[in-house]
Amino acid sequence: GESIVPSGAVAANALGLSTQVPMREMFLTSGPSRKISLGRTEVELRHAPQWQLKEGVAGAALRALLSFGEEYSAETLEQLWERLSESEKKQLVALRGSAPAWLAAAIGRQATRGEEAVVA
């Protein structure tokens, strides 16, 4: 079946990393890009690679960080890290292998900070 998950901007808002509410309803999908109407609301489904379609909090965290781009702040990543459970941190660390190099490196740096390193 087709996978559909919230976009990075929606994930960032849901995780409390952004107060901006996206103007358009956008989701990422394993299917083709398209727009569908649900009543008066138009929803955009944008095709994305499989690694961006991971479900759960760790998948949402990955999409949220990706939405900020390479200009993300270390402070944003620290805020996110504080909100994640140990299990979610491990899941995010495990997902970094499929992320772009800059994001994988940032997650790796965050995971090895502090008193205890988080290892997947």
Regions found by a protein language model. Give the residues of each.
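Short hydrophobic-aromatic micro-motifs
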Residues: 6, 43-45, 53
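Hydrophobic alpha-helical interaction segments
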Residues: 47-120
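Short gly/ser-rich loop at a beta-strand->alpha-helix junction or flexible surface loop bordering the NTP-binding
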Residues: 1-39
